[in-house]
Amino acid sequence: MQAQQLPYEFFSEENAPKWRGLLVPALKKVQGQVHPTLESNDDALQYVEELILQLLNMLCQAQPRSASDVEERVQKSFPHPIDKWAIADAQSAIEKRKRRNPLSLPVEKIHPLLKEVLGYKIDHQVSVYIVAVLEYISADILKLVGNYVRNIRHYEITKQDIKVAMCADKVLMDMFHQDVEDINILSLTDEEPSTSGEQTYYDLVKAFMAEIRQYIRELNLIIKVFREPFVSNSKLFSANDVENIFSRIVDIHELSVKLLGHIEDTVEMTDEGSPHPLVGSCFEDLAEELAFDPYESYARDILRPGFHDRFLSQLSKPGAALYLQSIGEGFKEAVQYVLPRLLLAPVYHCLHYFELLKQLEEKSEDQEDKECLKQAITALLNVQSGMEKICSKSLAKRRLSESACRFYSQQMKGKQLAIKKMNEIQKNIDGWEGKDIGQCCNEFIMEGTLTRVGAKHERHIFLFDGLMICCKSNHGQPRLPGASNAEYRLKEKFFMRKVQINDKDDTNEYKHAFEIILKDENSVIFSAKSAEEKNNWMAALISLQYRSTLERMLDVTMLQEEKEEQMRLPSADVYRFAEPDSEENIIFEENMQPKAGIPIIKAGTVIKLIERLTYHMYADPNFVRTFLTTYRSFCKPQELLSLIIERFEIPEPEPTEADRIAIENGDQPLSAELKRFRKEYIQPVQLRVLNVCRHWVEHHFYDFERDAYLLQRMEEFIGTVRGKAMKKWVESITKIIQRKKIARDNGPGHNITFQSSPPTVEWHISRPGHIETFDLLTLHPIEIARQLTLLESDLYRAVQPSELVGSVWTKEDKEINSPNLLKMIRHTTNLTLWFEKCIVETENLEERVAVVSRIIEILQVFQELNNFNGVLEVVSAMNSSPVYRLDHTFEQIPSRQKKILEEAHELSEDHYKKYLAKLRSINPPCVPFFGIYLTNILKTEEGNPEVLKRHGKELINFSKRRKVAEITGEIQQYQNQPYCLRVESDIKRFFENLNPMGNSMEKEFTDYLFNKSLEIEPRNPKPLPRFPKKYSYPLKSPGVRPSNPRPGTMRHPTPLQQEPRKISYSRIPESETESTASAPNSPRTPLTPPPASGASSTTDVCSVFDSDHSSPFHSSNDTVFIQVTLPHGPRSASVSSISLTKGTDEVPVPPPVPPRRRPESAPAESSPSKIMSKHLDSPPAIPPRQPTSKAYSPRYSISDRTSISDPPESPPLLPPREPVRTPDVFSSSPLHLQPPPLGKKSDHGNAFFPNSPSPFTPPPPQTPSPHGTRRHLPSPPLTQEVDLHSIAGPPVPPRQSTSQHIPKLPPKTYKREHTHPSMHRDGPPLLENAHSS
C-alpha cells in the first residue's frame, strides 16, 4: 500500500527558493495590462505572489488529474461570481493555447514544478488551466487595488494598498481568509494625514476633479450595469418604463464628462504667471448652453411622490425577479435596494456645484475669472432655485446625507476623521474585546436602532465596512462607583465578510425585517420601525456585500466597450501622426516610474515625438518643457513649426466600402463615429498644439527673435485658428507675443519690490563719479563684492537652457547660440586675471600683502552673499601659477584669512562635494558655480549616443535630452530670486569694462604674469628684492562690516547664519606670542605695528563657515569683535596716527621709531621704520638672516600623502576661463574655450570642466620654495647670484606637445603657521637661509 504523500509546503526553507520571485515579473506585466497608468513596488508584487501560491496550494490539495478536476475545485472553493469568470478565462486559455500562449504567467516554468507539488506528472493542458485561473485572480486583485489607489490619488501600488483594498472586498476575503477571524489591515493613521485648514482655489479645483471622476464612475455604474438590463429586455420593460426609472441620467453623464474635460484642459493650459487655473469660464460656457437643466427635470422625476412605488411595481412584474436574478447572484437585491440610493447621487452632486461655485468665486485671485464665476452663478440661479424647491419637499423627509447615497467609499476624504470617529465609538462601548475597529475597518457607514426578533430586545447598531456591532444602551441603569461611563455595552459583533444578508417578507411575527446568516448556518433577524428605515439598512448592507461584484461587472462591461469601439483614425498615408506605435518608431522607458500615469519616452522618430507632445489621450507638461528646451539638437525651429501646423490640420477618417454602400442607401453610419472622433481626437490634439505654441512663445521667444520669418509664420498660423473652444487660447498666445515684442523693443523692465530697502553703497578712498581712481584698494571691499555679485547674478540669470543643450557653446556658431553663457565665462576669466594682475604687479611686499588680504576680504563677502562663482574666481586666482608660488607674501597673511581661503578651496575638493551640500542648504538668491553644470552636460552629451538603432531604424535618443534638461532645470531654479542690493552704476561699469589683458594675446599675457611673479619673488633668492611703494594712499582696509548698519538693511541677503554647520567662533593666533594679542585692523604688513593686548579690530576676518555670530554683518550689539576707534581726519603713515581702544580710557601709543640707517648692516626689512622713511630715493638691500630651526607648514595639508618623501600634489582646480579676445583662440582646446595661461596648474579654458583634463594643458613651471626643509624636497644649491634684469621668464613649452617635462608645481597651504613672532621693529629677519650663500 502506497504511503500517503505529505502536503507540499510552498514556504518551507527547502521549497521557498524555487518559487520566490518566479511570478513577480509576470505579475508586473499583468498589472500593466489592468492599470497601465500605475506602477507597483516590489513588496506589493511579492505579496500578490504569496497570495497566488496560497491559491495554488488550495487547488493542488484536490489532487487534480484533469482540467475538469480543477474546474470542480474552483466551483467548490471560489465564491460566486468569481468562479464563473475564472473558469471562463481558463477554458479560453486552453482553446487559445493551441495557437499561441495567451498567458503572462510562466506556464513553462510552473509545469515541471507542479509534478513536484502533486507527486505525479500531469498533462500540460491541466497546467495551462491552473495557471489561467491563477492569472485571472491575480489580475482581479491588481484591478481592485488599482481602483483603490486611483481613488486616493496615488500612482504606485503598495503592499498596504493591497491589504486595505482586499479587506473591503468580500469576494477576495472569502477566498483567501476563510478561516481567519479578523484581518489586521494596519491603521489608516499610517497614511498621509488629511489636509486641514482653509483650502485655496487650486485645492478646491483639485479636490473637485477627483470627486467628479469618481462621480462619473458612479454614473457609469448606473447606466452600464443597472440601466442596461432594463434597456436590453424590451419585452419586460418598455422605453417608457426605462425613462420613468432613470430619467435623464444619460444627459447628466454627458454633461459631467464634458465639464471634466474642460476643467482638465484649463488646468493643463494655465499660464505659469496665473495665480491658479481659471475654471470659471468652464462653468460659464456650460451654464449659458443650459447644459445643467437636465438636473432639474431629473430631480423632479426621481423625487416625485410615488416614484418608489412605481419602481417596485416594475420589479414585481411577472418574470422580472427571475430575470434580474439570472444576471448575477444578489443583482435583484442590488436593484431593489442599492439602485434607488444611487439615483439620488446626481441630485446631491448638483447641489454641490452651487456651493463650489460660491467658494471658487470667493477664493479666485483673477478678476476675469471672478466675473466668469459670477456669471455662471447668475445663469444657474433658475436651476438652483428649482432644485432647492424640489429637494426641500422630498429630501427633507428622507433625512439622508449625501454619503448615504455614495456607492464608493470616499477614501480621498477625511481619513483622519474616519479614524477619529471609529475611536470615539469604540471608547463609548463597554466590554470591547479584540482588535480596534480601525484595524479591521476603513469607514463608518451608519448607525441606528433595530429590534432583535425573538428576544425582542432593542439593539443600537453601528455599521462599518468590515463590522456590524450590536450594543445595548446603558441609559437609565444604576452604575456602581468606578464603573465605566460608556453609553453602550457590547452584545455581539459580526464580520461583514462572514455573513450573508437575506431579505424577509412581512409576517404576523415581524415586519420590515432582514436576516443575517452566519457561516455556521445560525442566523439573527432584525426588524426596523418602518419600511423606509429597512430600505436604508438594506441599501447599506447589500452595497457592502455585492459592491465588489458590481464593480467587476462594470469593469468587464467597459473593457468590452473599449474593444468594440476602437476609434477609427485617418490613414497613416494621409496623416503621418496616425501611424501605430511600434519598436521601429517609439520606445518607452521600462525601469522609470511614470508620474501621473504617463509613460516616459526613451527614443522615437521626430513624428512620434511630436505626436506624444500633443497626444489626444493625456497631457504631459514635463515632456512639453523638456522637448522645447532640447529640440534644437535634432530639429530646427522652422521644421518644428511646420510639424505642429501639420499636426493641427487633422483630416477625418475616410469611409470604408461598407460605409459608402450605407451612405448610398440614405444611412449615416459615420455620424456617431465622426462625432466621437472630433470630440476625443481632433479637439484635444488641437488644444495641445496651441498649448505647445503658448509654451514656446512664453519661455523660448529667443527662437523668434533670431528669426523674424518664424514669428511671422507663427502669427499667421494663430490667426487662422477658429472655434469657440480655441478662442481664449488664441487670445492668450497673441497677448504673450505682443508683450514679448514690446519687451524686445523697449528692453526688459524689471520692477522688483523688496520687503526692505537695499543697504547703502559703501565707499572707501574713491568717491562716486571718480571712476579713474577706482581700483582694488580704493574701492570698499564690501561694495566690490556686492557689485560683482549683482553683475554675475545678472549674467547667470540671463543664461537660457537652449544655450547649453548639445554643448553648443563649444561649437562653431557659439556666438549665436550661447551669447549669454559666453558673457559669463569671459567675465569670470577677466576677473580672475585681474585679481592675478593686481597681485603680481604690486611689487612692494607690504602692498602686495595688503592686496592679497583685500581679495580675501572680498571672498568673505562673496561667501556672505552666496556668490559661489565669485568665491571660486578668487580661489582660481590664488591657485594660479603666478600667485600660488608667492611664499613670502602668503607667510604674512593672518591665519584667520588663510583659514577662510582654505575653506573656500575645500568647496572644490572631492568633486565639489562640500559646495553641492552648501548650495542645497542655503536659500536663494545665490550665484552658483556654472562649471559643474557645464561639466555634467558635456559628460552627458559625450557619454550617450545621439540616436538609438532599432530594427535598422535610427530613433532620436530622447532619454539623453531629458538628462540634459534635468541639469538645465537645476540651473533655472536659482535664476528667479534677485538680490536686494543697490546698483552703483560707476562701479558696475568699471567691472563690466575690465580688460586686464589690454591688447596682449593671452599666451603673451600669461607669460608676463609669470615672469612678473619671478621678478618680485625670484626662485631661491639670496636676499628678497626690494621695490618702491606703488600706492600713495593708506593700505589699511575699511573692513567687511557695513559702515552704517541699520535694522533691515545692515545684513546682506541670505546671511550664512542659516547654514546647518555650527562652529563656534575662536580666534586662531598667528604664533605663541600673538595668542595674547588681537589682530590688527588690516593685514599684517611692515607698516602695521603689533596692537595692544586684548585689542581687536573692526576688520577682523573670521571664517564664513563659523557659527551664527561669525558674520561680520551683524549689528554691533551682537558682534564678537571688540570695538575699535579710529581717529578722524586724514590718515597718516605714522604709527602714532593709529589708536586702538582697550577698555575705556587706556589707549597705548607705541613709541616713535628712529629712522633706518642705510649701511648694509642695517636691520632687516621687517623693521617698520625703514619703510616709513619717506626721504630714501631707493630701498636698501636686505641683508641675510639666520635660518630658523623650524619649518613652515605647507599651504595645504600633506596628511593625505602616502609618504613624506613623495612629491606633493598639484595646486587645486581652477574656476572657468573664457577668452576675451581673438575668436581664433576658441578652437585651441577640445572645448573651444580659452587655452591655458602659461605656467598654470590647470588651463582656464578647461576650468569650467574640473574633472576633464585637457591634453593641451602644459605642466606648470617648477617654483622651488626658498624653504627647502618645509617642502621635504631637495632644493638645488645656488651657484651664482641671480640677476633680476637678466631674467626673461621661464621657458615656454609648446601648446600641443613638448619634449620638456616640467615637474608640477608643489601645493601650498593657507594655514601657514609662523614659527617666529609676528613682524615688528625688533623681530628676526624676514627670510630663512639668508646667510647661506
UniProtKB/Swiss-Prot annotation:
Outcome of swapping residue 434 to K:
In NS4; requires 2 nucleotide substitutions
Record-listed Phosphoserine modification sites: 1078, 1082, 1134, 1161, 1178, 1210, 1229, 1275
Described by its record, this protein's role is as follows: Promotes the exchange of Ras-bound GDP by GTP. Probably by promoting Ras activation, regulates phosphorylation of MAP kinase MAPK3/ERK1 in response to EGF. Catalytic component of a trimeric complex that participates in transduction of signals from Ras to Rac by promoting the Rac-specific guanine nucleotide exchange factor (GEF) activity.
Q: Pfam families in the record, alphabetically?
A: RasGEF, RasGEF_N, RhoGEF, SOS1_NGEF_PH
Q: What is the effect of changing residue 37 to A?
A: In a patient with Noonan syndrome
User: Reported effect of changing residue 784 to T?
Assistant: In a patient with Noonan syndrome
Q: The PH domain covers which part of the protein? A: 444-548
InterPro entries linked to this entry: DBL_dom_sf, DH_dom, Histone-fold, PH-like_dom_sf, PH_domain, Ras-like_GEF, Ras-like_Gua-exchang_fac_N, Ras_G-nucl-exch_fac_CS
DH domain location is 200-390
Effect of changing residue 1140 to I: reported as: In a patient with Noonan syndrome
User: What keywords would UniProt list here?
Assistant: Disease variant, Guanine-nucleotide releasing factor, Phosphoprotein
Compositional bias, Pro residues, is annotated for 1208-1217, 1252-1264
Report if keyword Translocase is assigned: no
Q: Which GO terms describe its cellular component?
A: cytoplasm; cytosol; glutamatergic synapse; GTPase complex; neuronal cell body; plasma membrane; postsynaptic density
Q: Which GO terms describe its biological process?
A: axon guidance; B cell homeostasis; B cell receptor signaling pathway; blood vessel morphogenesis; cardiac atrium morphogenesis; cytokine-mediated signaling pathway; epidermal growth factor receptor signaling pathway; eyelid development in camera-type eye
GO molecular function: any one?
GTPase activator activity
Residue span(s) of domain N-terminal Ras-GEF? 597-741
Region named Disordered: 1019-1103, 1129-1333
What are the Polar residues biased-composition ranges?
A: 1133-1142
Q: What is this protein called?
A: Son of sevenless homolog 1
Q: Which organism is it from?
A: Homo sapiens (Human)
Where is it expressed, tissue-wise? Expressed in gingival tissues.
